[in-house]
């Protein structure tokens, strides 16, 4: 049995809590589509199709895998009842595809959920043909106000590993460098929005994010209250709106020739 984090419980609310503004979503799809011209692509952790459905609509030939059947069922619903590409319930650390089956691979906000993330990356590289490309967005709010609040909440709740898998871009760079790939940063995409500190804390308290799933309701409430006390000391009113800028950072890894 895998120890990767499964998103069965999040299927019904995932899109509501992870959606981007239409113009931001278009910018992400255009950015990735340019890298995928003429290539078939496998997305691991395809989920509800948040990225893949847009790429398919833009003309990319795709396949997708996910550990969670409810997430894949939501993808089918989002697609109008029939997925426009092949989807398979599978563990990213053991992909059911032959070597060099695809021209590209894609991993968005998934490697941090896989303790054996290095195995998943090697598997994804295995199914990508030579001179193909691997596209990765690690995600996470690090370095932002929301990231600081998440860290304070998890510390108060004594969550030891909010991200049980990959949490360091340099580790990914090092592994792929060992595999002969060349990494490059794609143009960042900015998603601006406004939120209060209370809203940020409430989202953690409600258990929407996988980093809080190991906690009981009582533990989340206690951590939220501790975080509120800290935030009031540091920032004053919890109801004041803050401009929050999410920077979406994709990296491309060009795989070597055989």
At which residue positions do the language-model features occur?
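Conserved class I S-adenosyl-L-methionine
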Residues: 1-37, 50-54, 71-74, 78, 133-164, ...
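Class I SAM-dependent methyltransferase SAM/SAH-binding core
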Residues: 42-44, 48-94
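Conserved Class I S-adenosyl-L-methionine
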Residues: 48, 184-258
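A conserved beta-strand element that flanks and buttresses the S-adenosyl-L-methionine
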Residues: 106
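Short catalytic micro-motifs in class I SAM-dependent methyltransferases
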Residues: 109-113
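A short glycine-rich, Lys/Arg-flanked "PGG" loop and its adjoining helix->strand segment in the class I
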Residues: 118-133
């Amino acid at each position: 049995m895998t120890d990767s984090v499964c998103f069965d419980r999040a299927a019904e609310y995932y899109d509501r809590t992870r959606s981007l503004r239409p113009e931001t979503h278009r910018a992400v799809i255009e950015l990735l589509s340019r890298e995928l011209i003429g290539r078939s692509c496998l997305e691991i952790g395809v989920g509800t199709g948040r990225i893949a459905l847009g790429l398919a609509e833009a003309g990319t030939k795709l396949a997708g895998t996910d550990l969670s059947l409810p997430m894949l069922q939501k993808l089918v619903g989002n697609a109008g009842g029939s997925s426009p590409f092949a989807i398979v319930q599978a563990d990213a650390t053991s992909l059911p595809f032959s070597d060099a089956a695809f021209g590209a691979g894609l991993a968005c906000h998934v490697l941090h959920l896989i303790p054996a993330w290095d195995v998943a990356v090697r598997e994804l590289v295995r199914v990508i043909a030579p001179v193909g490309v691997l596209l990765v967005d690690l995600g996470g709010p690090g370095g932002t106000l929301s990231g600081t609040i998440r860290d304070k909440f998890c510390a108060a709740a004594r969550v030891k590993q909010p991200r049980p898998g990959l949490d360091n871009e340099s580790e990914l760079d090092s592994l792929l460098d060992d595999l002969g790939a060349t990494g490059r940063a794609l143009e960042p995409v900015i998603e601006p929005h406004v939120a209060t500190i209370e809203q940020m804390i409430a989202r953690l308290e409600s258990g929407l994010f996988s980093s809080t799933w190991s906690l009981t309701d009582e533990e989340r409430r206690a951590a939220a209250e501790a975080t509120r006390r800290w935030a009031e000391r540091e920032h004053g009113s919890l109801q004041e709106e803050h401009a929050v800028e999410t920077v979406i950072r994709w990296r491309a890894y060009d795989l070597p020739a055989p």
